[in-house]
Amino acid sequence: MLQWLGVMAAAAIPFVESYFGAVIGVLAGLNPVVAIIAAVVGNVISMVLVVLSADRLRARRGVTPVEQLSPRKQRLRRMLDRFGVPGVSLLGQTVLPSQITSGALVAFGASTRGVIGWQVVSIILWGVAFGTLAVLGVDLVQNS
């Protein structure tokens, strides 16, 4: 009965996110719509907390000297320069979790509001896509 809370909590974990959270919910027997919504909500809550924390930290620290970026952050920076916040938000989940991607975008100076908006769109799209694939996979296995 409270499985959706477990799905929400799981989806808040980086690398589980809305996509695997939705799959977990479907495999646990939740209604797919409930599983996807719970996964999306959990992922969005954790992402917003990270974005707001990164924004506060950026405001406190002000402009800092350029530091040496890790290879993943360098790749993320190149993606930001090439595709902007929408592209990184939609494609960044193939490289890093939304929490890390969104925090890095804010740290790089992107608009907090824009990051949250595009990350929500991305989280919904990825959650729906993987939730749908999970439903199709379960149906395929059950009907074999």
Residue ranges and their predicted role:
Residues 11-24, 94-104:
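Transmembrane helix boundary and interhelical junction motifs in multipass membrane proteins
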Residues 20-22, 46, 84, 102, ...:
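Hydrophobic side chains within alpha-helical segments
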Residues 104-105, 130-132:
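Surface-exposed beta-strand edges and their flanking turn/coil or helix-capping segments
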Residues 1-8, 27-97, 113-114, 132-144:
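Membrane-interfacial helix-loop-helix
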Residues 15-16, 41-49, 121-130:
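Membrane-embedded alpha-helical segments of transport systems
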Residues 100-124:
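Hydrophobic alpha-helical transmembrane segments and immediately flanking/interface helices
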